[in-house]
């Protein structure tokens, strides 16, 4: 099954990495193009085929030197619930399953693959004063 990808999400991901945010992708899917795209955007922690997302997230946070109460996590389906409940800020795209929408702190107005990651990263960077830059937001 092919996943859709947003160029705006991609821009925000690479911009966040350039601004020093630590990003990770933990997916139950095994689609290598997801890994290639994320690595191409600068994400170093890309984990596919993750059956236990909370375990992966905990390991990644440890490697990054942060605790789960410093993590924002976006998920859209039942396998994300434990991870969503363990972090500081839980969010989901508006087309997530009802159980996830009910469990999160923030339902992002965009659908998955249509700018929801951009919205989260843009808000996080604006809060830190990192969204505007003299670099002109270059790729």
Q: Could you say what each language-model-derived stretch is?
A:
Residues 1-6, 45-47, 54-139:
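Mg2+-dependent phosphoryl-transfer enzymes with acidic/Ser/Thr/Gly-rich catalytic loops
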């Amino acid at each position: 099954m092919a996943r859709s990808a947003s160029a705006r999400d991609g821009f925000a991901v690479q911009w966040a990495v350039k601004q020093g945010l630590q990003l990770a992708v933990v997916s139950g899917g095994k689609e290598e193009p997801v890994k290639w795209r994320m690595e191409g955007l600068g994400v170093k922690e890309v984990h596919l085929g993750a059956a236990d997302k909370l375990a992966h997230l905990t390991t990644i946070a440890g490697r990054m030197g942060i605790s789960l109460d410093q993590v924002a996590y976006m998920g859209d389906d039942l396998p994300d619930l434990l991870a969503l409940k363990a972090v500081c800020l839980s969010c989901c795209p508006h087309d997530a399953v009802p159980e996830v929408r009910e469990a999160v702190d923030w339902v992002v107005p965009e659908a998955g693959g249509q700018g929801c990651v951009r919205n989260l990263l843009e808000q996080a960077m604006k809060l830190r004063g990192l969204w505007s830059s003299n670099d002109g937001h270059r790729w």
